[in-house]
Design a protein with these regions (language model features):
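Broad phosphate/nucleotide-binding scaffolds in NTP-utilizing and phosphate-metabolizing enzymes
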Residues: 1-176
Length: 176
């Protein structure tokens, strides 16, 4: 996403509220500048008191409210469209909007993402070329996700060929 990050103090508030502890009690290091920002949250690099380097995904403070408002607007437009268009009524666009809302609400629950990450990690464990981060469940909540820090590259960087040392043909062959 091309989204501006939200201020560190807001990230701190979310983390401390969710973990029921100060950042300093949980982490020995916590980067104030996010390494990535998206529409629903941002990621900070940190180090746990136990020494592990981690990625801390923090949900935007207003994410749930904004998503709910947007979903209500989408559903209202879909229902209105169905009222005036037989084709859209037959396409069941309001039902689609409701399902889309369910999917998007799941995106707001970082427990769901953590569970899916664990499932993927388990499924790909036998492949040397695949790395899926370990989830630190003790520090994961609905709005904060803490995982092992993994170096990586954005998919768009890979497809542009701007990442050194990556053989895309070999990677594609390994995948499938």
């Amino acid at each position: 996403d091309n989204v501006d990050p939200f201020p560190f103090e807001q990230a701190r508030e979310v983390v401390e509220e969710e973990l029921k502890a100060s950042i300093e009690e949980v982490f020995v290091e916590f980067g104030q500048e996010p390494v990535a920002a998206a529409s629903l949250g941002q990621v900070h690099k940190a180090r746990l008191r136990t020494g592990q380097q981690v990625a801390v995904k923090v949900q935007r403070p207003d994410a749930a409210a904004v998503v709910e408002m947007d979903l209500q607007i989408l559903l209202g437009v879909a229902r209105l469209a169905e009222r005036y268009s037989k084709a859209l009524q037959e396409a069941r666009v309001a039902e689609f909007a409701l399902e889309f809302g369910h999917v998007l609400r799941n995106e707001l629950n970082y427990y769901v993402e953590a569970y899916r990450t664990d499932c993927l990690r388990e499924a790909l464990a036998r492949y040397d070329y695949a790395k899926v981060p370990f989830v630190y469940w003790n520090y994961t909540t609905r709005r904060v996700l803490v995982t092992e820090w993994c170096r990586g590259a954005r998919l768009e960087e890979l497809t542009r060929g701007s990442v050194q040392g990556i053989n895309l043909k070999a990677a594609a062959h390994n995948i499938g």
